[in-house]
UniProtKB/Swiss-Prot annotation:
Its EC number is 2.3.1.180. One of its GO terms (cellular component) is cytoplasm. This is Beta-ketoacyl-[acyl-carrier-protein] synthase III. One of its GO terms (biological process) is fatty acid biosynthetic process. Keywords: Acyltransferase, Cytoplasm, Fatty acid biosynthesis, Fatty acid metabolism, Lipid biosynthesis, Lipid metabolism, Multifunctional enzyme, Transferase. Homodimer. The active site is at 112, 237, 267. It comes from Oceanobacillus iheyensis (strain DSM 14371 / CIP 107618 / JCM 11309 / KCTC 3954 / HTE831).
Length: 312
């Protein structure tokens, strides 16, 4: 069975926060932020908007593109580190909002690599024959766990959600290879402290990311007997432009073949890859039969990469 992505969707809060806005609350400026992160603005959800609200809207878009009803979904997986509350899961909340009465539902926690973990979990469930259609969502309200007095981290993060419907696709299409990994020895480099604020060792995370993203990309390509020259489009975790560019240059992939939503969206953790993917699809940057690589890394430390042939 060939299993791939039938539809994508993403949602952004309407509240735009520019670098100039951040100058008013921390000691920073637009040039400092842009040169170090590539970010010009990010979207922040208002207090009354929950992670589940953003996940719901992204899911609607993915269902519409897949031409499926909510009742057609057998399982909902939501990757998030910012659920509304510890429980119930965001997946259960949007199951009700969507009217997906036939779906099981659970959240996945693998930080910025969460969508990759969710996507491969969806594939494995479908491979068994137990389920036919799985909705995978990455959704984050990072603004609620950001320390707005820490200029090294508060400039990075934004809120939003991205979604994909996974199911059977045509011959030669869909997910062709994948890699998932973790190294718990690096847990202290990126974590949520007891004050519910993100703590990051930027230097160590950078060193890890610029090594792991290219290595994982090469691994999933070589599993197919192909080379990096065969990649039509790369969708990396939108962490930081310096990390993304360093990884791209190591891979020798041209700039026009890499998704860059970070300038407008910021770093959206587990939502960043599905948001960037959905935007690229909507803008026509990804075409039928393209070989796509999705690759990300996150706290844990965790990482994941997926190679897929685009199309239904």
């Amino acid at each position: 069975m060939n299993i791939g992505i039938l539809g994508t969707g993403h949602y952004l809060p309407t509240n735009v926060v520019t670098n100039n806005d951040l100058e008013k609350i921390v000691d920073t400026n637009d040039e400092w932020i842009r040169t170090r992160t590539g970010i010009r603005e990010r979207r922040l959800a208002t207090e009354e908007v929950d992670t589940s609200d953003m996940a719901f809207h992204a899911a609607l878009g993915a269902l519409e593109e897949a031409n499926l009803a909510a009742e057609d979904i057998d399982l909902i997986l939501v990757a998030t580190v910012t659920p509304n509350t510890s429980f119930p899961s965001v997946a259960c909340i949007i199951q009700d909002q969507l009217g997906a009465k036939n779906a099981a539902a659970m959240d996945v926690s693998a930080a910025c690599a969460g969508f990759m973990y969710g996507l491969i979990t969806a594939k494995q469930f479908i491979d068994t024959g137990a389920y036919k259609h799985v909705l995978v969502v990455g959704a984050e309200k990072l603004s609620k766990i950001t320390d707005w007095s820490d200029r090294t981290t508060c400039v990075l993060f934004g809120d939003g959600a991205g979604a994909a419907v996974v199911g059977e696709v045509g011959e030669g299409k869909g997910i062709l290879s994948f890699e998932l990994g973790a190294n718990g020895a690096g847990a202290k480099e990126l974590y949520l402290n007891h004050d519910d604020h993100i703590i990051m060792n930027g230097r160590e995370v950078y060193k890890f990311a610029v090594r792991q993203m290219p290595d994982s990309t090469v691994n999933v390509i070589e599993q197919l007997g192909l080379s990096r020259d065969d990649v039509d489009y790369l969708v990396p975790h939108q962490a930081n432009i310096r990390i993304m560019e360093a990884a791209r240059e190591r891979l020798g992939i041209s700039e026009d073949k890499m998704a860059k939503s970070i300038e407008k969206f910021g770093n959206n953790s587990s939502a960043s890859i599905p948001m960037a993917l959905s935007e690229a699809v909507k803008e026509g940057k990804i075409k039928d039969n393209d070989l796509i690589v999705l690759v990300g890394f996150g706290g844990g430390l965790t990482w994941g990469a997926v190679a897929l042939r685009w199309g239904k």
